[in-house]
Amino acid sequence: MAIVSSKQSPQPDGSKKPSQAKSVKKSVEHSKPQQTDALLQPEAVQEEFVGKQDDKLRPQRFDEYIGQRELKEVLDIAIQATKSRQEALDHLLLYGPPGLGKTTISLILAAELGVNCKVTSAPALERPRDIVGLLVNLQPRDILFIDEIHRLSRMTEELLYPAMEDFRLDITIGKGQSARIRSLPLKPFTLVGATTRVGALTSPLRDRFGFVQRLRFYEADELGQIVLRTADILKAKITSDAAEEVARRSRGTPRIANRLLKRVRDYAEVKHSGEITQTIAQEALELFNVDPCGLDWTDRRLLTVMIEQYNGGPVGVDTLAAATGEDSQTIEEVYEPYLMQIGYLNRTPRGRVATPAAWTHLGYQPPDEQMRLLS
């Protein structure tokens, strides 16, 4: 059971036309650059602490936390009210794409409240006794953070129901006619759950959270501030223009922004004098196959397959997965959210559709039928 305590320290040629789709089918069948996928997939790095440097990159207080203004305001009010009443904070469910700071927020909450935060994930809670061991060892008003909470087993989830509502554990002792239920009192605590699939949670579990908050993608100016802050911590020299360049290609995700910054820093130190300018940032990101819109090879491949093989769509996600060799769940959870956010992909009742902006970005001329479909 993995537990961490907070106290422990190829783009298509622009000359191609839709009518040439079949003849250029092979353009999307090249070998897949592995480095790019690792750079731009938010879940490529685990949320748990992996080193002192990664720990330093996390803001420790909300006044250091950049972005998510509305969420911070809601939580600040809750923190002040909770501290004045000397109560445990209401249970909190955070949902949204990976890499937006759900674990960081739980650690900040613990710091603001002056309590401990135990960090774990649902897959690590394989047996009921795992969650029981965590709950009985929590101190008053402590925070228990469970990542990927939608993956809890049924038995573990049912143990949480009375724990969340009444701060007690109902444990069945014995079997058959001799079985009896024993209730163990728990100290008041706060459960913070994180998920990328809020719809996968059962209603009984979801309804027991006092707060249900969504984390949104970050704006480019917010990511620019994050890049500058990270560069300062890493003692990397970077210009504001270079920070903006990294931010624009970070898919609205701080984790990706920090990862790209580290790779650009490596490039600047090896190929240049060490200072990161906008030109050097552009060179490095082009080397890593990250285009100015933040699309990597796989993003462009998905869109290219839709355009070349299905005339832009509509096409079902399972069909698209089979045509590209990607997993349908990965397409839905990793690639689609950002493509939809920047307006390159639409979900319709008939399937996925590449928008005119996607056609233009990849160097194609959108057909009239595709324009009418989206009108």
Swiss-Prot record:
Q: Which residues bind DNA?
A: R347, R352
Q: Which Gene3D superfamilies match?
A: 1.10.8.60, P-loop containing nucleotide triphosphate hydrolases, Winged helix-like DNA-binding domain superfamily/Winged helix DNA-binding domain
Q: Where is this region: Small ATPAse domain (RuvB-S)?
A: 219-289
Report the record's disulfide bonds. Answer: none
Query: Any idea which positions bind Mg(2+)?
Result: T103
Keyword Signal among record annotations: no
Q: Enumerate the GO terms in the molecular function aspect.
A: ATP binding; ATP hydrolysis activity; four-way junction DNA binding; four-way junction helicase activity
A GO CC term assigned to this protein in UniProt = Holliday junction resolvase complex
| EC code | 3.6.4.-
Where does it mainly reside?
cytoplasm
Region annotation Disordered: residue ranges?
1-44
**One GO biological process from the UniProt record?**
DNA repair
Instruction: Could you list this entry's UniProt keywords, alphabetically sorted.
Output: ATP-binding, Cytoplasm, DNA damage, DNA recombination, DNA repair, DNA-binding, Hydrolase, Nucleotide-binding
Can you state which reaction this protein catalyses? ATP + H2O = ADP + phosphate + H(+)
Stretch list, region Head domain (RuvB-H): 292-375
Recorded superkingdom: Bacteria
Q: Which InterPro entries match?
A: AAA+_ATPase, AAA_lid_4, DNA_helicase_Holl-junc_RuvB, P-loop_NTPase, RuvB-like_N, RuvB_C, WH-like_DNA-bd_sf, WH_DNA-bd_sf
Biased-composition ranges for Polar residues?
1-22
Per UniProt, the enzyme's principal EC class comes to: hydrolase
Q: Where in the cell is it found?
A: Cytoplasm
Segments for region (Large ATPase domain (RuvB-L)): 13-218
Subunit-level organization: Homohexamer. Forms an RuvA(8)-RuvB(12)-Holliday junction (HJ) complex. HJ DNA is sandwiched between 2 RuvA tetramers; dsDNA enters through RuvA and exits via RuvB. An RuvB hexamer assembles on each DNA strand where it exits the tetramer. Each RuvB hexamer is contacted by two RuvA subunits (via domain III) on 2 adjacent RuvB subunits; this complex drives branch migration. In the full resolvosome a probable DNA-RuvA(4)-RuvB(12)-RuvC(2) complex forms which resolves the HJ.
- Family stated for the protein in its record: Belongs to the RuvB family.
The written remark on domains in the entry is: Has 3 domains, the large (RuvB-L) and small ATPase (RuvB-S) domains and the C-terminal head (RuvB-H) domain. The head domain binds DNA, while the ATPase domains jointly bind ATP, ADP or are empty depending on the state of the subunit in the translocation cycle. During a single DNA translocation step the structure of each domain remains the same, but their relative positions change.
So what does this one do? The RuvA-RuvB-RuvC complex processes Holliday junction (HJ) DNA during genetic recombination and DNA repair, while the RuvA-RuvB complex plays an important role in the rescue of blocked DNA replication forks via replication fork reversal (RFR). RuvA specifically binds to HJ cruciform DNA, conferring on it an open structure. The RuvB hexamer acts as an ATP-dependent pump, pulling dsDNA into and through the RuvAB complex. RuvB forms 2 homohexamers on either side of HJ DNA bound by 1 or 2 RuvA tetramers; 4 subunits per hexamer contact DNA at a time.
What protein am I looking at?
Holliday junction branch migration complex subunit RuvB
Q: Which organism is it from?
A: Acaryochloris marina (strain MBIC 11017)
Q: What is the lineage of its organism?
A: Bacteria, Bacillati, Cyanobacteriota, Cyanophyceae, Acaryochloridales
Corresponding gene? ruvB
